[in-house]
């Protein structure tokens, strides 16, 4: 017999028992997708050993969902090969919203997706067992996949001695690390979403491929809910709303580098202004560093050797320069402009820097995936003893910022990777424990991602949930034990000796362009008044009312409100409709009665007609709504 631990209980099992054997004794075990054994995700077919700690996962868990979607990708590939035997499967990973599979030697259209879905349904109905095969070295694996050059390339690149595995279901076998579902049966609901062109390994110089995207769920109900969410997402698409509301545009001459229009800049300025006020109150000092810096800087930071493929470089006076892809190195140079003492720590330095990173054209998408964007970075220099308290300060700042926009979020703590890290075990333990204690003290739920930290330190990622329950990874808090050392940063400690500071690198919005795209979709273009590109539109009934309208607009603009006048020849109803289509918060109609009685006829963008009110009452309420950063109308 062997003893294993599950849910903090010790269980005895026969020697040689698998996780599936154990699961069969547990109620509702048919929902299990896999098992986490000693913090490693595994197949249910895995043999258990003495002392193993188990946690079974379902579709509701991130690990279980990945297994489910990965098996779904294999079902897709098997279906395609049954319909088009000449197709060559390449890779089929899980992505944020489902999965895809890339094929060479295949030509399909959107009309073919239904036929593929029908074949996938047949494969699910066959309840094919999924089994794992471990090859005895590269030679055996290459022999198995000798007719697939893409798989052979992947095999050849594997380090010597690394385990090489494949998974089979029926006649289909795929090179894969796994894990997978025990059979095809649980994949009861799926939908193929679209096709697109792709390149092998994302390299335009390599083979052209066809990519098929899909999504899958354990039940039809969940699939229907997801498809409804996708339809709702289409209505909220920031690219469509951005054009409709005249916020920004994309130009062919600068792919991935958005043009912000005057209305978009009003939203931008409101967003940045709020960020600056918040950070000033939190003790941050703002800097601005150059976009173009010499190669020597990027060699010191490590970007030249590790990130050059994503950088835009050029020569000036026969020397190499690069447009900055990140703000961090510039802040290191600022730190070195003077001497520092432990007495000024934590030293909080913030920058909204314009950065550029190369992305392949096929990956670009509106404001969400760009080549040029602004990042709201801050670097906090501190002593090791200050890490926990300062992390808690940042987490409190995160809470205040995201609640201002009505956004829910969750946190993920990523710990030390197994290989290729810098810093001592003691320092890693100190840093990770400090971040974890800060998370606990913040009373915010979080999960731990073992081994998913950066090579230079542990990190906390901030995942935001929008109005239709999608999650977006926005901000991050990273403890950096690397750059201060590379740049030879120093401070005088309490003993009067020179020490290297610890650095917390954090971004709350992340990419401001991306965050703005999220906000457009979250609010469906209906910005709260303080963020809105147009607070009030004055609508005249006749030409004789124009002077009064312009007088009011000028007075209100001096109060910091964004006010326009529609004195066109359109009918009043058409003017109101135009304003509502542009999501103007309030429409004020001016006619003879309003001017005589010094009152206002007010309508909201949701077509609520308000009781007539005085100018003073209206403006005082509007200013309160704006200055309080209210998410809901006060009228």
From Swiss-Prot:
Residues 237-528 are annotated as: Catalytic. PROSITE patterns: AA_TRNA_LIGASE_II, TGS. SUPFAM superfamilies: Class II aaRS ABD-related, Class II aaRS and biotin synthetases, TGS-like, ThrRS/AlaRS common domain. Coiled coil: none annotated. It comes from the Bacteria. Residues 1-58 form the TGS domain. It is found in: Cytoplasm. Its EC number is 6.1.1.3. GO terms for molecular function: ATP binding; metal ion binding; threonine-tRNA ligase activity; tRNA binding. Transmembrane segments: none annotated. It catalyses: tRNA(Thr) + L-threonine + ATP = L-threonyl-tRNA(Thr) + AMP + diphosphate + H(+). Homodimer. Belongs to the class-II aminoacyl-tRNA synthetase family. Catalyzes the attachment of threonine to tRNA(Thr) in a two-step reaction: L-threonine is first activated by ATP to form Thr-AMP and then transferred to the acceptor end of tRNA(Thr). Also edits incorrectly charged L-seryl-tRNA(Thr). This is Threonine--tRNA ligase. It comes from Chlamydia caviae (strain ATCC VR-813 / DSM 19441 / 03DC25 / GPIC) (Chlamydophila caviae).
């Amino acid at each position: 017999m062997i003893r294993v631990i599950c849910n903090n209980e010790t269980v005895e099992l026969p020697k040689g028992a698998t996780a599936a054997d154990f699961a069969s004794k547990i109620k509702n075990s048919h929902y299990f997708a896999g098992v986490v054994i000693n913090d490693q995700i595994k197949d249910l077919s895995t043999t258990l050993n003495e002392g193993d700690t188990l946690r079974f996962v379902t579709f509701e868990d991130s690990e279980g969902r990945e297994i489910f979607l990965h098996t779904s990708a294999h079902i897709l590939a098997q279906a395609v090969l049954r319909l088009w035997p000449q197709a060559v499967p390449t890779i089929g990973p899980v992505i944020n919203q489902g999965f895809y599979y890339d094929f060479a030697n295949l030509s399909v259209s959107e009309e073919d997706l239904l036929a593929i879905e029908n074949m996938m349904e047949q494969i699910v109905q066959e309840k094919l067992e999924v089994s794992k095969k471990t090859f005895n070295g590269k030679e055996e694996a290459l022999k198995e996949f000798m007719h697939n050059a893409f798989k052979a390339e992947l095999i050849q690149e594997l380090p010597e001695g690394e385990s090489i595995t494949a998974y089979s279901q029926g006649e289909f076998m795929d090179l894969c690390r796994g894990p997978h579902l025990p059979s095809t049966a649980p994949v009861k609901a799926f939908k193929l979403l679209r096709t697109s062109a792709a390149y092998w390994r994302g390299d335009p110089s390599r083979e052209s491929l066809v990519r098929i995207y899909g999504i899958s769920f354990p039940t039809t109900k969940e699939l229907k809910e997801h498809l409804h969410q996708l339809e709702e997402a289409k209505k909220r698409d920031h690219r469509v709303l951005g054009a409709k509301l005249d916020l920004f545009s994309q130009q062919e001459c600068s792919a991935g580098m958005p043009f912000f229009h005057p209305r978009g800049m009003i939203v931008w300025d409101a967003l940045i202004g709020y960020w600056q006020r918040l950070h000033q109150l939190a003790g941050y000092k703002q800097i601005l560093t150059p976009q173009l810096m010499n190669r020597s800087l990027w060699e010191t930071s490590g970007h030249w050797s590790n990130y050059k493929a994503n950088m835009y470089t050029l020569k000036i006076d026969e020397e190499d320069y690069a447009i900055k892809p990140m703000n961090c190195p510039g802040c290191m140079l600022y730190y070195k402009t003077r001497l520092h003492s432990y007495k000024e720590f934590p030293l909080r330095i913030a920058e909204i820097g314009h950065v550029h990173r190369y992305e392949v054209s096929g990956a670009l998408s509106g404001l969400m995936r760009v080549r040029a964007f602004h990042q709201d970075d801050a670097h906090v220099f501190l002593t090791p003893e200050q890490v926990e308290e300062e992390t808690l300060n940042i987490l409190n700042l995160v809470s205040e910022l995201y609640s201002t926009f009505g956004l829910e979020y969750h946190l993920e703590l990523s710990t030390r990777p197994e290989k290729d890290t810098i810093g001592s075990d003691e320092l890693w333990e100190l840093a990770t424990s400090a971040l974890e204690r800060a998370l606990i003290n913040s009373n915010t739920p979080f999960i731990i991602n073992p081994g998913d930290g950066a090579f230079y330190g542990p990190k906390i990622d901030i995942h935001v949930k929008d109005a239709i329950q999608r999650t977006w990874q926005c901000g991050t808090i990273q403890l950096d034990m690397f750059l201060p050392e590379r740049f030879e940063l120093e401070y005088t400690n309490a003993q009067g000796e020179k020490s290297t500071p610890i650095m917390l690198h954090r971004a709350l919005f992340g990419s401001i362009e991306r965050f703005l795209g999220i906000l457009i979709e979250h609010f469906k273009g209906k910005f709260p008044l303080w963020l809105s590109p147009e607070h009030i539109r004055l609508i005249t009934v006749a030409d004789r009312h124009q002077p009064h309208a312009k007088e009011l607009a000028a007075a209100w603009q001096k109060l910091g409100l964004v006010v326009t006048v529609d004195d066109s020849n359109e009918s009043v109803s058409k003017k109101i409709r135009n304003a509502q289509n542009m999501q103007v918060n309030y429409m004020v109609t001016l006619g003879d009665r309003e001017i005589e009685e010094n009152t206002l006829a007010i309508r909201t963008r949701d077509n609520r007609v308000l009781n007539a009110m005085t100018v003073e009452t209206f403006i005082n309420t509007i200013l309160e709504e704006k200055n309080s950063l209210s998410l809901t109308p006060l009228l």
